[in-house]
Swiss-Prot record:
Keyword Phosphoprotein attributed: yes
Pfam families reported for this sequence: DUF4512 (PF14975)
Family: Belongs to the UPF0729 family.
Lineage: superkingdom: Eukaryota
Keywords, alphabetical: Phosphoprotein
Annotated protein name in UniProt: UPF0729 protein GD16342
Region (Disordered): 64-97
Positions of post-translational Phosphoserine modification: 69
Organism field: Drosophila simulans
Amino acid sequence: MVCVPCFIIPLLLYIWHKFVQPIILRYWNPWEKKDAQGNVIKKGPDFPFECKGGVCPFVPGAKKPEKASVGPAEESQNPPLNAIAAETEVDESKKEI
């Protein structure tokens, strides 16, 4: 059998969140957005990704800046990860034999 608080508390919380809280928040809502004069803001902010004046700052698929070309001296200092992984696999196979 379930104890009384284990049954009553979730039931009261459900009733509070579904029915009582929305009614109370209509008349007293401390989390409402207000402007500097204390008036409630009814309208939300504009969509920030609109193109205004024929210029759109957020173009999908825009080109990313390319890195400077890497010379052969820099490649030897930083070998690709695949080469490192291949070398470790070869070393491990030699250890097993």
